[in-house]
From Swiss-Prot:
Alphabetical keyword list: Cell inner membrane, Cell membrane, Ion channel, Ion transport, Membrane, Transmembrane, Transmembrane helix, Transport
Function of the molecule: Channel that opens in response to stretch forces in the membrane lipid bilayer. May participate in the regulation of osmotic pressure changes within the cell.
InterPro entries: Mechanosensitive_channel_CS, MS_channel, MSC/AndL, MscL_channel
UniProt subunit comment: Homopentamer.
Family: Belongs to the MscL family.
Listed Pfam families: MscL
SUPFAM superfamilies in the record: Gated mechanosensitive channel (SSF81330)
Membrane topology value: Multi-pass membrane protein
Name assigned to this protein: Large-conductance mechanosensitive channel
Length: 143
């Protein structure tokens, strides 16, 4: 069997196609979660913490060059200038993003597994010998 033929069989299998669709939908879904975190959750957390903006929280690890013309309090400006910064605020945002995404995926898997559960099987039919013995018992009771 040639390599091309083997690859073709592999590529058209249901699992590979399902995976491709899942990756595409996951990419689009992660943008939604990013927006929920950045635009909805982080502003609320900022209000609750007194206007704290996590996205711009960092620790300066290097020295700011004398030629730096940006805002020395801006994480993005310092990072763009190549200054070593430890951006823990960005990490907190990504962590919240991950927790939300993991929880939503957990709920989806739980729902799908609930749908996949087979219906309760009907009770097995009583074997003929048991039926016959019951008939004999009932017949003897009537005498």
């Amino acid at each position: 069997m040639s390599i091309i033929k083997e690859f073709k069989e592999f590529a058209v299998k249901g699992n590979v196609m399902d995976l491709a669709v899942g990756v595409i939908i996951g990419g689009a879904f992660s943008k939604i979660v990013d927006s929920v975190v950045k635009d909805l959750i982080m502003p609320v957390i900022g209000v609750l913490t007194g206007g704290l903006d996590f996205s711009n929280k960092f620790v300066l690890l290097g020295t700011v060059p004398a030629s730096f013309k940006g805002n020395p309090d801006s994480f993005k400006d310092l990072q763009a200038a190549g200054v070593a910064v430890f951006g823990y605020g960005s990490f907190i945002t990504v962590l919240i993003n991950f927790i939300i995404l993991a929880f939503i995926i957990f709920l989806m898997v739980k729902f799908i597994n609930k749908l996949r559960k087979p219906a309760e099987a009907a009770p097995a039919a009583t074997p003929e010998d048991i039926v016959l013995l019951r008939e004999i018992r009932d017949s003897l009771k009537q005498r």
